[in-house]
Regions:
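Hydrophobic pocket-lining residues within nucleotide cofactor-binding pockets
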Residues: 38, 61, 88, 116-119
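A short coil-to-beta-strand element that immediately follows conserved catalytic motifs
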Residues: 60-68
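Conserved Nudix-box catalytic region and its N-terminal flanking loop in Nudix hydrolases
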Residues: 16-56
């Protein structure tokens, strides 16, 4: 069985959480985290996360901490999602790069700031549900 590892970031930007609104022309949009697949050239999960943050939102991250792992078994591939919490140190959308930015068929990615509270999170319909459930239960612990 092949295993595919992905890294995902729940980002804190000041007093807000930062997510991505992902959408396609003529299709529904949804909210998700910054992140993607770990590539063979990534030194480790953290390096992959930092690369994805730069590619998708042009962000430099502070220290990262893994808080949740979700395993999605499949017939041919098992996907392991590693979720990290990190502060955004700076962000410049003009620094975005990577395949997502070059191929319109992959949709668009727009950063969205959300208040650091349960009500705002519930309104997002954040995917996947395991992450949304975890955040609703623990978000109070993330306040400074």
């Amino acid at each position: 069985m092949k295993v595919r590892r992905n890294v995902r970031a729940v980002l804190l930007d000041g007093d807000d959480l930062l997510f991505l609104r992902r959408g396609w022309p003529g299709g529904p949009s949804y909210f998700t985290t910054v992140g993607g697949g770990v590539e063979p050239y990534d030194a480790d999960l953290e390096a992959a996360l930092r690369r994805e943050a730069m590619e998708e939102i042009g962000a430099t991250l502070g220290p990262v901490a893994e808080f949740l792992t979700v395993t999605e078994p499949g017939e041919r591939v098992t996907v392991v999602q590693h979720y990290f919490r990190a502060d955004v140190l700076d962000m410049d959308l003009s620094r975005r790069n990577g395949p997502e930015m070059d191929d319109p068929d992959l949709g668009n990615f727009s950063p969205v700031r959300v208040a650091l509270d349960v009500t705002a999170l519930a309104a997002l319909e954040l995917q996947p549900t395991e992450l949304a459930d975890y955040l609703r239960e623990h978000i109070g612990e993330w306040r400074a």
